[in-house]
């Protein structure tokens, strides 16, 4: 796996985590 693919995978994982956090915060409001 080249570094670009690895960076994209990490970026997508981080974005999914952020979305999950935003949904949690929205539910807690």
Swiss-Prot record:
Tree of life domain: Bacteria
Induction details: Expressed during exponential growth in rich medium and at lower levels in exponential and stationary phase in minimal medium (zorO mRNA cannot be distinguished from zorP mRNA by these assays as they are practically identical).
Transmembrane parts of this sequence: 10-27
Annotated membrane topology: Single-pass membrane protein
Cellular compartments annotated: Membrane
GO cellular component terms, semicolon-separated: membrane
Alphabetical keyword list: Membrane, Transmembrane, Transmembrane helix
Location, primary (coarse class): membrane
Cited function: Toxic component of a type I toxin-antitoxin (TA) system. Overexpression leads to cell stasis and a decrease in colony-forming units. Probably repressed by cognate small RNA orzP. Base pairing occurs between 18 bases in the 5' UTR of zorP mRNA and the 5' end of OrzP sRNA.
Protein name as annotated: Small toxic protein ZorP
Species annotation: Escherichia coli O157:H7
Lineage: Bacteria, Pseudomonadati, Pseudomonadota, Gammaproteobacteria, Enterobacterales
């Amino acid at each position: 796996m080249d570094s670009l693919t690895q960076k994209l995978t990490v970026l997508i994982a981080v974005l999914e985590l952020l979305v999950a956090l935003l949904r949690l915060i929205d539910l807690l409001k």
